[in-house]
Amino acid sequence: MTNNTKTITLNLGPQHPATHGVLRLILEMDGEVVNNAVPHIGLLHRGTEKLIEHKTYLQAIPYFDRLDYVSPMCQEHAFALAVESLLECEVPRRAQFIRVLFSELTRILNHTLNIGSQALDIGATTPLLWLFEEREKIMEFYEHVSGSRMHSNYFRPGGVAADLPEGLLEDIDKFIEQFPPKLHDIESLLNENRLWKQRLVDIGVASQKEAMDWGFSGPMLRGSGIAWDLRKSNPYDVYDEMDFKVPIGKNGDCYDRYFVRMLEMYESIKIIKQCIEKMPKGAVKTDDPKLTPPTRAKMKESMEAMIHHFKLYTEGYDVPAGETYKAVEAPKGEFGVYLYSQGGNRPYRCRIKAPGFAHLQGLDFMSKGHLMADVITIIATLDIVFGEIDR
């Protein structure tokens, strides 16, 4: 007997709403079962790394907001740390606490969108509506400190752009008091829901070895049972002073990755509480005049201060020759920046390591043998944003 099985090649995306951006997938299918899933990337490529080479170190910061535009402040954090490493400048403690505070708010901002949209992809509408209500509050905090809801451009090499407005810490404190009950409500809808578990448990399994081999990081790696978190293993700013746990999964399936993200939000709340309690007084920018512009009061009195301000924003500052790699534990995984300076006011090379790039490459092996509907679930738990993948 001859086997006359014929596979179907299906094009999914790039306009499909469930692909979370401009993902184009070429699926080779045997009926409803997926044999291969080949991602086609590059549809959102804007040449970010090359553009940064033609900008000063200060002008480069807004490009990082536009990579993973769901968690912008964490990307800025990595670039600021890399520039500070080359400059060997000291960041005031208040600025470090503010950075950590907003990095954790950003983590909640990211995970609420991921869990809400994941539920929507599977067919549950309510979690998205409830979580978007909470995201709106965090976006208002963004707006208070930076004037922008999304592309904040707030972190700076040497600190942050401006101090916290009066009353903001109290507002954030109120938010983290009322947020955990909302998370409990979401968990009561999803955790033991029969349909939710049928769609997530044992779907898209990545073993510990596979997760390591494919270069996974963040919730993708921790969901497979590996407790690797840069905030613990290689702490930056004041993370070494924070008391929090690293949630991990057991099976490495979609359900574990969902649950790790849910638990991470509770840990972020703990860190935010500690930041508010320990927040010191003081400056929010380094006192090095080469990096920090003069105050408005000085500019009204001194012509030299006006010239200094103008030159700082047009020509920037020179960074000593050298190279460095700095990474942060972004909500999606390890986001890294490799900087190479030749001693001028612009980076000679800026290489960006995006966690989503490695995660998307793992889609093929995680999808094999699953149904077409399961591919949508797996894409949702990868938590991909094409701003950072295509750059």
Curated annotation (Swiss-Prot):
Compartment annotation: Cell inner membrane
UniProt-listed InterPro entries: NADH_Q_OxRdtase_suD, NADH_UbQ_OxRdtase_49kDa_CS, NDH1_su_D/H, NiFe-Hase_large
GO cellular component labels: plasma membrane
Name of one Pfam family that matches: Complex1_49kDa
Gene Ontology molecular function: NAD binding; NADH:ubiquinone reductase (non-electrogenic) activity; quinone binding
Membrane topology: Peripheral membrane protein
Catalytic activity as recorded in UniProt: a quinone + NADH + 5 H(+)(in) = a quinol + NAD(+) + 4 H(+)(out)
Major location category of this protein: membrane
Enzyme Commission numbers on file: 7.1.1.-
Top-level taxon of origin: Bacteria
Class of this enzyme: translocase
Keywords attached to this entry: Cell inner membrane, Cell membrane, Membrane, NAD, Quinone, Translocase, Transport, Ubiquinone
Subunit structure: NDH-1 is composed of 14 different subunits. Subunits NuoB, C, D, E, F, and G constitute the peripheral sector of the complex.
HAMAP family, sorted: NDH1_NuoD (MF_01358)
Its biological purpose: NDH-1 shuttles electrons from NADH, via FMN and iron-sulfur (Fe-S) centers, to quinones in the respiratory chain. The immediate electron acceptor for the enzyme in this species is believed to be ubiquinone. Couples the redox reaction to proton translocation (for every two electrons transferred, four hydrogen ions are translocated across the cytoplasmic membrane), and thus conserves the redox energy in a proton gradient.
Alphabetical list of NCBIfam families matching this protein: NuoD, PRK06075.1
Recorded family membership: Belongs to the complex I 49 kDa subunit family.
Listed name of the protein: NADH-quinone oxidoreductase subunit D
Naturally occurring in which organism (per UniProt): Rickettsia massiliae (strain Mtu5)
Lineage: Bacteria, Pseudomonadati, Pseudomonadota, Alphaproteobacteria, Rickettsiales
